Amino acid sequence: MDLTCKDVCYSIKDKKILDHLSVSVDKQRFVSILGPNGCGKTTLLKNIYRVLKRDSGEIVFNGKSIDDLHLKEAAKKIAVVAQFNEINFDCSVKDMVLLGRTPHIPFMQSETHKDYEIVEDALQKVGMLDKADRSYLSLSGGEKQRVALARAIAQQPTLLLLDEPTNHLDIRYQIEILQIVKDLNINVLAVLHDIQLACRYSDYIYLMKQGTIRYEGKPQTTITEQAMHDVYGINCKLTWTPDQQALIEYI
């Protein structure tokens, strides 16, 4: 199911954080948003999943304004992995992931065998099945991030919103997690920090600066030496491998 944001504006007091920003995700594509710290990437995601309320503009999901979408219906279709996943109550890893099934369980009914199968499959995908009975609070930051992704996968969404999903992960798990997300074959809108990983896994990239989209398109046409200088203020030499990996030499 498709997502379209058109001319979205958001301000804090007199400071404009998002300035007539437009992005879209469709056709089961992996779309990434890149840009320097403070440019509004996370703020955009929060406006999409309604933690923040935009000042103006349209956010449409599957042809319907998100303002008209009931929260439970939205939770069946849209999953979020936020940048920080600190939770103050403890439960098992399995029960934490089972929370992803909540929107699909009718009121006053219990989880089914199928729900538990979905949870186990999600834990298997992120390499955490062997820790299913562990205390969630005993996990490392990276393990908690993988559990958060498993919970999102267990929702079986058609749109996945990711805010730096590889935060706290070593490079092996960064690659594995992004490949898992890619293999879901659903619409993905991801805020990423690592430019090279974004180029490797993204079908389309938006480059943000100061609340606006400065560049957009396929990785090889968007991530250029000029764009890197304009957006990040750095000079670099950029080459591409045949399998769409960007090699960036900072100079």
Where are these regions (language model features)?
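The feature captures the beta-strand-to-loop junction immediately N-terminal to the Walker
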Residues: L34-P36
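Helix-to-loop junction immediately C-terminal to a conserved catalytic motif
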Residues: Y49
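Conserved ABC transporter NBD signature motif
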Residues: G57-S65, A74
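Conserved ABC ATPase signature
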Residues: S135-L139, E143
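A short, proline-enriched helix->beta-strand linker immediately N-terminal to the Walker B motif
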Residues: A154-T158
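Catalytic Walker B motif of ABC-type/P-loop ATPase nucleotide-binding domains
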Residues: L160-E164
